[in-house]
Amino acid sequence: MKLDPNEKWSEEKDPRGYRQGDAIPEGDPVCIVPWTTICLSANGNIKPCCAYDADNDNKHFNFYYGDTLEDAHLGFEWLRKAFANQEKPAQCNQCWKNESTLSNSRRSWVYDKIKNKPKSYPVESPLKLKHMDLNFGNTCNLKCRHCGSWGSTNWFKEDIKLNDINKKFKRAVNHAKVRDVDPNYWIERQHYFEDMERIDFKGGEPFMQQGHYDVLKMLIDNGSAKNVELGYVTNGTKNPEELEELWPYFKRINLNISVETSKPGLYEYFRGGKIQNIDQLEQSIYWFDQFDNVNAHFSIAISTYTIFDLQELGDWIEQITSSTRSFKTLLANRTSDHKNRYEKPNNFNSVVSDPAYLDPNNMPPHMKQKVLNRWNKNYHNMEHLREAMLRTEYDPEQWELFKQYTKELDRIRGESVLDHIPELVGEL
């Protein structure tokens, strides 16, 4: 269902309640994030949510520069006012773009996840968190091609080299340093978690960050774990035994395993090394499937590198979900009407838009047609992806940047994209 401001959700239309993908109910702000949520990014930026464009902001708040969550919450008063007035600020363009492309967005996700919503939305609002995106740093064992130093310590050297080659690659060289939040910061501020419904851990790779385990132990010790849902975005390379002791204390574990392709060879190429192949990822999935309180999904960031094999990834997900308990949510044949929707679909719900040269919508028409010629199934959101590709005008500059970026990174890593994506033969 497309997010349409003229088609507001109501209990009469769907008595099962609001679900992600519905339009925000009439009378509520455009987005409830700055009243309920806050995000500490891996680079230390304090933002309303992970989709917020802090680089487009007049005032930055950063944990490593001494800013506090209170400072940021007060600083976002203008955003609460804008949302209360039904405005759509430029800093939130990712939501508006995702809604037009995928009929989904972060603001819709938050509205779905926060169950005990505020009764009112005053502009001058106290910091009373229901949800937190908590990232303890950028430590990661992979260097995926759509990532950078902000999200992986393995990107540092290559980011510097790419930045020297072409500044238009927009590599995050200012983040090429190890970030590591001291867990004592949170342990000394347990009042932040008094009304918490959900905490999402990302990264870096969250299972490689000791602070994450320390916070879980804190929530168990103070008795609040039973009321808190945990969310993760993990690359699936780590299966920490410590989780077997900690996770059962929590209300629910929402596990999102990132996977962009299931094609052997391309999987390793995209992730930047031989640390794990697709068969090993499957074994990791079966390990996570042992937990009774885990709801598991796949986090899929669609880029020019992976869009050609998107339908095959859908087939792979169908095969995995048919043989697991926690991943018992099918991707195929999820219809757009409320009556027949699956409760927890594994959908294609994210397109890489930054950097823009990795956005498949910026490919030339003949390349888009190559993609569309491969699709003959109607996995959820593929119809929206198809519409967006046809609707979005080709950007020659971004396509040239994609080709240069790919060739230069291939040279640095000693690889060739043509070994894995034959559709690009003759293009580079």
Regions of interest found by a model, annotated:
Residues 211-217, 240-247, 309-313:
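Distinct, well-ordered alpha-helical segments
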Residues 304-320:
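Catalytic cores of alpha/beta
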Residues 186-192, 217-223, 246-248, 288:
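Leucine-rich repeat
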Residues 129-139, 148-181, 194-210, 222-241, ...:
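Core AdoMet radical
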Residues 2-29, 34-37, 45, 68-135, ...:
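N-terminal [4Fe-4S]-dependent radical SAM core
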Residues 31, 49-50, 92-95, 140, ...:
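Short cysteine clusters
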Residues 2-18, 51-99, 292-295, 338-344, ...:
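C-terminal accessory region of radical SAM enzymes
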